Swiss-Prot record:
This is Uncharacterized protein Rv1549. It comes from the Bacteria. PANTHER family: LONG-CHAIN-FATTY-ACID--COA LIGASE (PTHR43767), NONRIBOSOMAL PEPTIDE SYNTHASE PES1 (EUROFUNG)-RELATED (PTHR43767:SF1). Pfam families: AMP-binding (PF00501). Transmembrane segments: none annotated. InterPro entries: AMP-dep_synth/lig_dom (IPR000873), ANL_N_sf (IPR042099), ATP-dep_AMP-bd_enzyme (IPR050237).
Length: 175
């Protein structure tokens, strides 16, 4: 996993596969897991790391102004995954993340992976015309963004099922 420039990921197991919540929930196997078992999915590796050292710092902003422990990171990932599942996001769906560098990006990204969705970061400087191509090409079902980008997302004209703002409710549509 490559961290955004202003965040440093201190430790994350990386494996090529993804999981979905309908498969095996790694936390339910917590007591069975040994340190010699290799996780079989990226999601299982993430949850295993969170269980092994829950109070260790997982994310830290430059200067240490914001930190997130593995315990908090994993809890946020579970909430995000549940929220996305509640919106109807399933394995194979696409979730687009459009925001400035924020610590919230990481639980959103990993939470989408936990429901089997493909998540990707969208440059927040793209004009609506380019967003049209990006969202159409990806088959975006949900866009998670900051309020300041909602008008541009809507101006893309792509029929996004849900726009979720990390900093409040999306502004009402202009008539």
């Amino acid at each position: 996993m490559v961290a955004a420039p202003c965040f440093r990921v201190l430790r994350l197991w990386t494996y090529a596969h993804r999981c979905d919540l309908g498969h095996t929930d790694p936390l339910s196997r917590r007591t069975e897991m040994t340190t010699t078992e290799r996780p079989t999915t990226m999601c299982e590796a993430f949850q295993r790391t969170a269980v092994m050292d829950p109070d260790a710092v997982a994310l830290r902003t430059p200067g240490g102004n914001q930190t997130m422990t593995w315990r908090d990171y994993a809890a946020q990932v579970r909430r995000v995954a549940a929220g996305l599942a509640g919106l109807g996001v399933r394995r194979g769906d696409t979730v687009s993340l459009m925001m400035a560098n924020r610590i919230e990006f990481y639980p959103l990204d990993v939470g989408a992976q936990h429901v089997g969705a493909t998540s990707f970061s969208v440059y927040n400087t793209l004009p609506a015309e380019q967003l049209t191509y990006v969202f159409d090409n990806a088959g975006t079902k949900v866009v998670i963004c900051e309020q300041q980008y909602v008008d541009r997302v809507r101006a893309s004209g792509v029929p996004i099922e849900h726009i979720v703002c990390v900093d409040g409710a999306p502004p009402a549509r202009s008539r």
